[in-house]
Amino acid sequence: MRECISIHVGQAGVQIGNACWELYCLEHGIQPDGQMPSDKTIGGGDDSFNTFFSETGAGKHVPRAVFVDLEPTVIDEVRTGTYRQLFHPEQLITGKEDAANNYARGHYTIGKEIIDLVLDRIRKLADQCTGLQGFLVFHSFGGGTGSGFTSLLMERLSVDYGKKSKLEFSIYPAPQVSTAVVEPYNSILTTHTTLEHSDCAFMVDNEAIYDICRRNLDIERPTYTNLNRLISQIVSSITASLRFDGALNVDLTEFQTNLVPYPRIHFPLATYAPVISAEKAYHEQLTVAEITNACFEPANQMVKCDPRHGKYMACCLLYRGDVVPKDVNAAIATIKTKRTIQFVDWCPTGFKVGINYQPPTVVPGGDLAKVQRAVCMLSNTTAIAEAWARLDHKFDLMYAKRAFVHWYVGEGMEEGEFSEAREDMAALEKDYEEVGADSAEGDDEGEEY
């Protein structure tokens, strides 16, 4: 088996976790108490969904997941919510006081009190796996727990499970809306610390998702539930190939192999289509060609940046539902002729395709329409550097005046860590610039890696 353990850190991670597990349960026909009426073989480990669920002797399916937060309120909602019976109480780990939007508290002072407990629980989950494939870590960049504790956890996971892949789903601070003033600090500190420990990080920017909800789903004032349900659809598309059998199945390690040309350049851009409300879907065809084209619209991306200004290094199209390879090939051929999509010259237009016959499931009473087919595109493009540049600029404005730095130093950090992290980010921006540059200029660029 190729099991995956999901780790949900901090408020954002936990709430996205709720949306994801709700959707997984619907997709696999698992009831909120973990029973699965359709599954007659108790203890049979041959079904694909067992990558995400373990099965007890009593036939109860338990998510291979850990929820961690340094303060209890958010996870208490899981403990009392609809899915309270789904999780083992030991999988829901809470501290007493929160990280107060402070990376240093999450990483040093408060985080270190709880890290061993968390690793112990993860170890128990890992011991139940026959062939652990890797970890999916969900967190935000802006929060104290999401940034500080996640980076601590990633460092420790690298030590304990050296070769296992670690994929992140990170909530990137939105360009316009902000939930905390110190988001740029936390984001840059966590990116710097996690850069060498993460194999692949899918970033999601709340503002981009807000816009999609407003524009495509006609929700005037999207709530976090709306956002998280949309994010969970994307996560579900990415993980569908691990949980269902399909024609062209994609494995966790396959993502990395196909999307990450250099170890540091591991931030693919996710795009999902069709995001459409039930009223509209009723009148539309949504052919393979249409949804494939929609993936190349900046409006459907999960991070605000413009790939038309950047170059693509790799592209992965994950289809699910009623899709045949013939249609996919035709759609891709059309896109290649358009020439609006520029690939770097050292990577001929490679599209990796995954097809899964399980149609997309929607949460009843949710906003998304039930459709026959959907596609999630993961593309590694140099345009994502725009997102880093934006964040770095905000960091610089605050750090020039050393604003808020004393909160971090007071928790045992040193100012040097800030400048070190910022230099690393500058190097990352430079890496993106060099990858996008034409290789004809000089062949001596390969020495860095």
From Swiss-Prot:
<feature type="site" description="Involved in polymerization">
    <location>
        <position position="449"/>
    </location>
</feature>
<dbReference type="Pfam" id="PF00091">
    <property type="entry name" value="Tubulin"/>
</dbReference>
<protein>
    <recommendedName>
        <fullName>Tubulin alpha-1C chain</fullName>
        <ecNumber>3.6.5.-</ecNumber>
    </recommendedName>
</protein>
<keyword id="KW-0206">Cytoskeleton</keyword>
<keyword id="KW-0488">Methylation</keyword>
<feature type="active site">
    <location>
        <position position="254"/>
    </location>
</feature>
<keyword id="KW-0963">Cytoplasm</keyword>
<dbReference type="GO" id="GO:0005929">
    <property type="term" value="C:cilium"/>
</dbReference>
<dbReference type="GO" id="GO:0005634">
    <property type="term" value="C:nucleus"/>
</dbReference>
<comment type="function">
    <text>Tubulin is the major constituent of microtubules, a cylinder consisting of laterally associated linear protofilaments composed of alpha- and beta-tubulin heterodimers. Microtubules grow by the addition of GTP-tubulin dimers to the microtubule end, where a stabilizing cap forms. Below the cap, tubulin dimers are in GDP-bound state, owing to GTPase activity of alpha-tubulin.</text>
</comment>
<dbReference type="InterPro" id="IPR017975">
    <property type="entry name" value="Tubulin_CS"/>
</dbReference>
<keyword id="KW-0597">Phosphoprotein</keyword>
<dbReference type="Pfam" id="PF03953">
    <property type="entry name" value="Tubulin_C"/>
</dbReference>
<feature type="binding site">
    <location>
        <position position="206"/>
    </location>
    <ligand>
        <name>GTP</name>
    </ligand>
</feature>
<dbReference type="InterPro" id="IPR037103">
    <property type="entry name" value="Tubulin/FtsZ-like_C"/>
</dbReference>
<feature type="binding site">
    <location>
        <position position="11"/>
    </location>
    <ligand>
        <name>GTP</name>
    </ligand>
</feature>
<feature type="binding site">
    <location>
        <position position="145"/>
    </location>
    <ligand>
        <name>GTP</name>
    </ligand>
</feature>
<dbReference type="GO" id="GO:0007017">
    <property type="term" value="P:microtubule-based process"/>
</dbReference>
<dbReference type="InterPro" id="IPR018316">
    <property type="entry name" value="Tubulin/FtsZ_2-layer-sand-dom"/>
</dbReference>
<feature type="binding site">
    <location>
        <position position="71"/>
    </location>
    <ligand>
        <name>Mg(2+)</name>
    </ligand>
</feature>
<keyword id="KW-0007">Acetylation</keyword>
<dbReference type="InterPro" id="IPR003008">
    <property type="entry name" value="Tubulin_FtsZ_GTPase"/>
</dbReference>
<keyword id="KW-0479">Metal-binding</keyword>
<dbReference type="GO" id="GO:0005200">
    <property type="term" value="F:structural constituent of cytoskeleton"/>
</dbReference>
<feature type="modified residue" description="3'-nitrotyrosine">
    <location>
        <position position="282"/>
    </location>
</feature>
<comment type="subunit">
    <text>Dimer of alpha and beta chains. A typical microtubule is a hollow water-filled tube with an outer diameter of 25 nm and an inner diameter of 15 nM. Alpha-beta heterodimers associate head-to-tail to form protofilaments running lengthwise along the microtubule wall with the beta-tubulin subunit facing the microtubule plus end conferring a structural polarity. Microtubules usually have 13 protofilaments but different protofilament numbers can be found in some organisms and specialized cells.</text>
</comment>
<dbReference type="GO" id="GO:0046872">
    <property type="term" value="F:metal ion binding"/>
</dbReference>
<feature type="binding site">
    <location>
        <position position="228"/>
    </location>
    <ligand>
        <name>GTP</name>
    </ligand>
</feature>
<keyword id="KW-0378">Hydrolase</keyword>
<feature type="modified residue" description="Phosphoserine">
    <location>
        <position position="439"/>
    </location>
</feature>
<dbReference type="InterPro" id="IPR008280">
    <property type="entry name" value="Tub_FtsZ_C"/>
</dbReference>
<keyword id="KW-0493">Microtubule</keyword>
<feature type="modified residue" description="Phosphotyrosine">
    <location>
        <position position="432"/>
    </location>
</feature>
<dbReference type="GO" id="GO:0005525">
    <property type="term" value="F:GTP binding"/>
</dbReference>
<dbReference type="GO" id="GO:0016787">
    <property type="term" value="F:hydrolase activity"/>
</dbReference>
<dbReference type="InterPro" id="IPR000217">
    <property type="entry name" value="Tubulin"/>
</dbReference>
<comment type="similarity">
    <text>Belongs to the tubulin family.</text>
</comment>
<keyword id="KW-0460">Magnesium</keyword>
<keyword id="KW-0342">GTP-binding</keyword>
<feature type="binding site">
    <location>
        <position position="144"/>
    </location>
    <ligand>
        <name>GTP</name>
    </ligand>
</feature>
<dbReference type="InterPro" id="IPR023123">
    <property type="entry name" value="Tubulin_C"/>
</dbReference>
<keyword id="KW-0547">Nucleotide-binding</keyword>
